[in-house]
Amino acid sequence: MTSSDVIPASTTSSSGWIASVGSAAGWVWDGMKVTGSVFNDYGTSTTRNTVCTTATVAGGFLGGWSGGAIGSAVGTLILPGIGTAVGSFLGGASAALVAGKATIVVTDRVLDTISYDIETVSCEKCGRGFRCKLYKEGRDKLCYRCK
């Protein structure tokens, strides 16, 4: 390492730490969501909540990353400099929200189709069969009509 490899302190960005703190806060929040899902699943002896939350976090991350890249490119074309920053923020935030919501819908449909953590059981009161969503309700013994 030579002296030319070292960046003087006066040329470093003062807003760099804000971005670092924001990124860390996002990762902590996502980690808390996944951890909460693990605890919920542990209580009901299922894994579906963890699978859905992990897929949603991954979808939101990938959507935000790609939306930020596209937004910054469009912003640079419109107004280099400030347009890059604004486009990156708007593209990343909006794409992360849309991708996260889309991931929830797709994941639920796929897992419902394969009956992941869903059992068909007979109601103890009326004898009708019903689909028991173990990951939501636990092991219900009564159908929705008899509750």
From Swiss-Prot:
Superkingdom classification of source: Eukaryota
The name this protein goes by in its record: Uncharacterized protein ZK688.7
Organism annotation: Caenorhabditis elegans
